[in-house]
């Protein structure tokens, strides 16, 4: 069976009817959509759509609504009230800094990232174990304040819309390296049509990725999510066309990367019962899932580290980890934290002749196991 495909960035908006969503799903290979209401559409309408299309719609709790956009102080209480129902499995799209998109009637916004309200959203996302998608443009003015807020909320799973706030690839990697719970969606609507300010595009033309972006996605395939950003009815009406364009570009990625980005990563961020419903209806296999009836023992989590000949760089490789689980590396000898199955860092001069402890944590939805190893630096230098 084919891997599950989840579009993590869709919007219920005026003119987006149940029949239009059905038509969009029938135009391509997408199995399910994460759906956020865009004013004047409401959360109640998204719940109704999910009830009408079981296993096809992941209910998002909407933020493109008046109470959030005017920063109403009581908005957090309403968000928590809805989360307590257990019906909402994603938050978004939280508008923070938005350059605006006149072609679709979207004005610019700059609500600020270091606010009690946004910090409250991250706290609720952590408390209720739901991912939160944010629209926040990365630029020199916002970089450090955003970093500092994330440092205060490292347990929140944040999906940074539009390829990490349309960051340059090296800037995106810097943030992804530091924050293991940070993901980026690749939603670009129509690939090459600009609805606002053009910045660091993913694609050079309709047949070619920006090479630096492609390299980063291949290097960190567990940190990117597929989405189209169907934000108006016209995009749903032409969903098959946009999906065909995306499929062509994603075919240029390795098969493992493609499977993770197109749905495997999103599935790991959702409750198991939700993923089971999606997979059952779509008749697909979820990447990284393990059958509950398996009798195969789970191998021990291991770390294999080596010191280069000059004694200045430690290189580590994970072993025994389960596919689809979240890996996080740390060390007493480095401030660098990263995800993935490998970990490299330089040895500072003041540590030569001592030792370094490397830690690896493997987690899925709050269940974790760890491994550690001590690297002797006595021979370094």
PLM features: residue spans?
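Mid-to-C-terminal alpha-helical segments outside catalytic/metal-binding sites
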Residues: 1-4, 9, 19-23, 27-32, ...
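Active-site gating/metal-coordination segments in enzymes
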Residues: 40-131, 190-191
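A short beta-strand segment in extracellular, disulfide-stabilized domains
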Residues: 311-320
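Solvent-exposed segments in extracellular or luminal domains encompassing
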Residues: 341-358
């Amino acid at each position: 069976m084919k891997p599950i495909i989840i579009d993590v960035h869709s919007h219920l908006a005026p003119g987006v009817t149940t029949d239009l969503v059905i038509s969009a799903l029938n135009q391509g290979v997408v199995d399910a959509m994460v759906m956020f209401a865009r004013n004047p559409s409401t959360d109640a309408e998204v719940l109704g759509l999910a009830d009408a299309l079981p296993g096809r719609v992941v209910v998002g709790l909407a933020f493109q609504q008046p109470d959030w956009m005017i920063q109403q102080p009581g908005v957090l209480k309403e968000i928590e009230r809805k989360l307590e129902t257990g019906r909402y499995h994603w938050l978004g799209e939280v508008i923070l800094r938005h350059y605006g998109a006149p072609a679709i009637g979207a004005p610019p916004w700059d609500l600020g990232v270091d606010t009690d309200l946004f910090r409250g959203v991250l706290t609720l996302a952590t408390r209720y174990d739901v991912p939160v998608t944010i629209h926040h443009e990365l630029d020199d003015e916002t970089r450090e304040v955003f970093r500092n807020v994330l440092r205060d909320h490292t347990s929140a799973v944040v999906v940074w819309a539009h390829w990490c706030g349309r960051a340059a690839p090296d800037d995106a990697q810097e943030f992804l390296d530091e924050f293991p719970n940070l993901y980026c969606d690749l939603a670009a609507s129509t690939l090459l049509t600009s609805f606002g300010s053009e910045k660091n595009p993913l694609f050079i033309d309709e047949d070619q990725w920006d090479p630096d972006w492609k390299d980063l996605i291949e290097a960190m395939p567990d940190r990117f999510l597929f989405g189209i950003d169907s934000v108006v009815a016209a995009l749903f009406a032409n969903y098959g066309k946009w999906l065909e364009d995306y499929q062509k570009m994603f075919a240029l990625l390795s098969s493992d990367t493609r499977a993770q980005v197109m749905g495997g990563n999103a599935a790991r961020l959702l409750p198991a019962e939700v993923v089971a419903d999606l997979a059952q209806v779509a008749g697909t296999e979820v990447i990284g899932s393990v059958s509950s009836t398996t009798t195969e023992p789970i191998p021990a989590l291991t770390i294999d580290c080596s010191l280069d000949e000059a004694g200045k760089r430690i290189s580590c490789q994970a072993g025994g980890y389960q596919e689809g689980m979240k890996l996080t590396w740390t060390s007493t000898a480095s401030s660098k934290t990263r995800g993935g199955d490998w970990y490299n860092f330089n040895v500072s001069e003041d540590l030569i002749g001592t030792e370094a402890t490397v830690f690896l944590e493997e987690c899925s939805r709050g269940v974790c196991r760890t491994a550690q190893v001590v690297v002797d630096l006595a021979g370094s230098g």
